[in-house]
Amino acid sequence: MKHYSIQPANLEFNAEGTPVSRDFDDVYFSNDNGLEETRYVFLGGNQLEVRFPEHPHPLFVVAESGFGTGLNFLTLWQAFDQFREAHPQAQLQRLHFISFEKFPLTRADLALAHQHWPELAPWAEQLQAQWPMPLPGCHRLLLNEGRVTLDLWFGDINELTSQLDDSLNQKVDAWFLDGFAPAKNPDMWTQNLFNAMARLARPGGTLATFTSAGFVRRGLQEAGFTMQKRKGFGRKREMLCGVMEQTLPLPCSTPWFNRTGSSKREVAIIGGGIASALLSLALLRRGWQVALYCADEAPALGASGNRQGALYPLLSKHDEALNRFFSNAFTFARRFYDQLPVKFDHDWCGVTQLGWDEKSQHKIAQMLSMDLPAELAVAVEANAVEQITGVATNCSGITYPQGGWLCPAELTRNVLELAQQQGLQIYYQYQLQNLSRKDDCWLLNFAGDQQATHSVVVLANGHQISRFSQTSTLPVYSVAGQVSHIPTTPELAELKQVLCYDGYLTPQNPANQHHCIGASYHRGSEDTAYSEDDQQQNRQRLIDCFPQAQWAKEVDVSDKEARCGVRCATRDHLPMVGNVPDYEATLVEYASLAEQKDEAVSAPVFDDLFMFAALGSRGLCSAPLCAEILAAQMSDEPIPMDASTLTALNPNRLWVRKLLKGKAVKAG
């Protein structure tokens, strides 16, 4: 059985209060002065005090082979903040730290270890507040208002480095080669790791490690680093430092899924919902000049305009990409929303998904068999459902304790206001008719003979994304749906969690004393007119799922209060995020892809044209991480996702999968 949780560190604290691994019989940091050793070995060994002021780019990337207690990261973060305070006009503005950890500490052990360094407390408290649950893969933490990014990869580093996307090659400015001593943990210190470090290192990048072991030095030299010994810290005689003095060839394992960014930093975003709002923030944080064109007279009038939307992950035992993406997207979304400096109605009250028939019970049983962390999802028996949700259903299910609901419309509006304060320009009632290349830019033609020219364009306009010649063949479809707004009752007022069944029901919003119940589903429709049939069907589905519940029968939809919207979806339930693929060129270039993979060129795409679409009914869960992925790709920065899952988000995926099998591809 595949496990979807990570085993925590098995440790104890010695007489000095230093954490010691029981499995590796080694300390996490020196009993003497771990903080000073970190400064000497890793910051000094990589000459960061000198390199920070001279760095020619706005971002400095550090990678590390063992996160442990986070001492190296916290020490570096402190030094980076001190550098920024002393050099506010320096080119270097942001720090990106990538670390791999097979056995992460629990939050409690992390906090206990951090008591060793009171001077690091301001930084340690921020790390503890965002410490992720033990799920495999990449967890992105945005710290210090986004000026510091931490990518925590949970799992075996030798496995994870082989799963990294090619876009991370030659991105690392400095390596911290840390971990338990080679004699204690020989499985980590492999030639495979050294080769991966060399592949990821930028030409001119450096490394430092506490060990001076000969096989480590020789392995790093074989990988491509120029190595030298340096005086060790304290009682240690020697340590190793290295430089990547050559430019290694860049491998591309799957060119048909290759992602390209842009050398430009000026962009137009087409849309007015949660996708365009969150992407605007992510790009502004990276120094982009951003303009947003919305077809409506105000934001969030489309699919992002609902009063309440549920936040919980979409899990699947049989779809690895779906499971990996949504579990990590959900945890990122919670961290993101919790630190977002805007107000919006929400309640992280939990979400319970109920097994109301044999099929749904089987699906839930499969999810519960995946060894998920209890922080993510737990089983709940029928007799306990009433206790945790407040209403009787006679159904068992699965509870997502960190889930809940939020107001998408308010979130979108307030995020855009925040983005405007940071420089976003918004143009309302600009309906894009078509776009074309002109002099290395994109010419945008709007209704009413309005025009604009921009270096880069992102299409984030929901179900209308396929209305342009460049996107008309995308395999996406529209789904119209109606959400009913129902007044509360004494029984409904007791509802404490979001209920999911063959529909969903939210607790009442204190702002209006109403609940949301929905939603109808009409594939291929873009009709947003009120439907009395849909209103009654929303009520009837609730009754059918809980036939013994009197409170369900008392739901009143007679006041005809509802909201109709149209979503954009795909048949594999995953978003489309990345370069807009060139359909005609893809068919020509990849006509013989199944037989000629070794000769494949990079994926044919439209230059400087990107898309952020097909969020379906899970946009509140997926949009924050998708915005971060796309902004990182566009900016040529590290992307917080493994290669196979990124492949599953690529807009060309459905075409390429068929071509790889030698099958014909049809548009749409």
Swiss-Prot record:
Classification via SUPFAM superfamilies: FAD/NAD(P)-binding domain, S-adenosyl-L-methionine-dependent methyltransferases
Primary site of residence: cytoplasm
GO molecular function terms listed in the Swiss-Prot or TrEMBL record: flavin adenine dinucleotide binding; oxidoreductase activity, acting on the CH-NH group of donors; tRNA (5-methylaminomethyl-2-thiouridylate)(34)-methyltransferase activity
Catalytic activity of the protein: 5-aminomethyl-2-thiouridine(34) in tRNA + S-adenosyl-L-methionine = 5-methylaminomethyl-2-thiouridine(34) in tRNA + S-adenosyl-L-homocysteine + H(+)
Disulfide bond entries: none
Listed GO CC annotations: cytoplasm
EC code: 2.1.1.61, 1.5.-.-
Residues covered by region (FAD-dependent cmnm(5)s(2)U34 oxidoreductase): 270-668
Keywords of the record: Cytoplasm, FAD, Flavoprotein, Methyltransferase, Multifunctional enzyme, Oxidoreductase, S-adenosyl-L-methionine, Transferase, tRNA processing
Keyword Oxidoreductase: yes
Cofactor(s) needed by this chain: FAD
Pfam families with a match to the protein in the record: DAO (PF01266), Methyltransf_30 (PF05430)
InterPro entries: FAD-dep_OxRdtase (IPR006076), FAD/NAD-bd_sf (IPR036188), MnmC-like_methylTransf (IPR008471), SAM-dependent_MTases_sf (IPR029063), tRNA_MAMT_biosynth_bifunc_MnmC (IPR023032), tRNA_MNMC2 (IPR047785), tRNA_S-uridine_synth_MnmC_C (IPR017610)
Segments of this protein annotated with the region tRNA (mnm(5)s(2)U34)-methyltransferase: 1-245
Location(s), subcellular: Cytoplasm
Similarity remark: In the N-terminal section; belongs to the methyltransferase superfamily. tRNA (mnm(5)s(2)U34)-methyltransferase family. In the C-terminal section; belongs to the DAO family.
Function: Catalyzes the last two steps in the biosynthesis of 5-methylaminomethyl-2-thiouridine (mnm(5)s(2)U) at the wobble position (U34) in tRNA. Catalyzes the FAD-dependent demodification of cmnm(5)s(2)U34 to nm(5)s(2)U34, followed by the transfer of a methyl group from S-adenosyl-L-methionine to nm(5)s(2)U34, to form mnm(5)s(2)U34.
HAMAP family: MnmC
Name used for this protein in its record: tRNA 5-methylaminomethyl-2-thiouridine biosynthesis bifunctional protein MnmC
Species the sequence originates in: Shigella sonnei (strain Ss046)
Organism taxonomic ancestry: Bacteria, Pseudomonadati, Pseudomonadota, Gammaproteobacteria, Enterobacterales
